[in-house]
C-alpha cells in the first residue's frame, strides 16, 4: 500500500513491523468475500470476519507480538458496519504510518451478476434501505471506489462460481505449492458399523478369512504372515490395482471442485485381518500419488 497518512489519521501506538502476513479482504457485497475467507482458511490462514476497521491496529499489534501463533492473518471487512466503515481509508493510512505491513484484496463483480446473486439468496443488500437491490449496489460501489483504487489486488468474480473463486484464491495465496488433497484411508469391521464420514466404502470379505486359520487368528493384517495369506488369494492384488486406479481420476475431479479432504473406508468382518492388510497396501500406493497426503487408520483393530 502507498496511501499517504492524512492529517487527521487515528493515532496508533507504534509497533514493530510484523513477521506475520496481514491480508485485508474487502470489496462488493455478493462478490465472494465469504468464499475467499473459507479458501484462505483451507490454506492455513487465521481469518477474522466482519472486523470494525478501527480494530485493525489492535489486531495487527497482536499479530506482531505473536507471529508464531498468527503467521498468516486475514481480516474480512465490509460495509455492514456502515458508519464504522467510513474511517477505513484513514485507518489503513494510520496502519501504514505506524509500520504495519499489509496488503488489500478487493473483490468485485458486475452489477448484473451481483443483482442475480442477491435475488438467488433472497436477501436485501446492506445499503439498499427502502430502495432496489441495484440502488444498494451502486451506493456501495461509490463508497468503495477509493479503496478499490488503492488495493494491491482486484479480483473480478463476475464469471466465477464458488469453485472457481476458491481456486483463484488458492493460486494467489498458497505459499506451499499446489493445494494438497488430504486422504484418510481407514480399515474397519462391518460388525461395528460403516464409518459415517466415509466417501468411499470397499468390502473385502470376498477374501478368505484368516480368522479361521489357528496360527493367524491372534495376528493382524499388519503382520507379514497375514498379509501374505491375504495377497495369495486370487483377486486380492487385482482388487487393489483397480481400486487405486478408480480413485485417481476421482481425486483429480476433487481438486477441480476444490474438495480438499476424503475418507476411504475398507471393511471386513471384524476389521482385524483382511481389511487391515488391504488398507495398508492401498495407503502405500496412494501415498505415492502427487499432491496427496495419507492418514492411515485402523479403526477396529484390537477391538475384539
Swiss-Prot record:
Which stretches are annotated as coiled coil?
none
Keywords assigned: ATP-binding, GTP-binding, Nucleotide-binding
SUPFAM superfamilies, per database record: P-loop containing nucleoside triphosphate hydrolases
Q: Name one GO molecular function term.
A: GTP binding
| Keyword Mitochondrion in record | no
**Does the keyword section mention Nucleotide-binding?**
yes
Show the HAMAP family listed in the entry.
RapZ_like
In terms of NCBIfam families, this protein maps to:
PRK05416.1
Family membership noted in the UniProt record: Belongs to the RapZ-like family.
The name this protein carries in UniProt is Nucleotide-binding protein KRH_12070
Q: Which organism is it from?
A: Kocuria rhizophila (strain ATCC 9341 / DSM 348 / NBRC 103217 / DC2201)
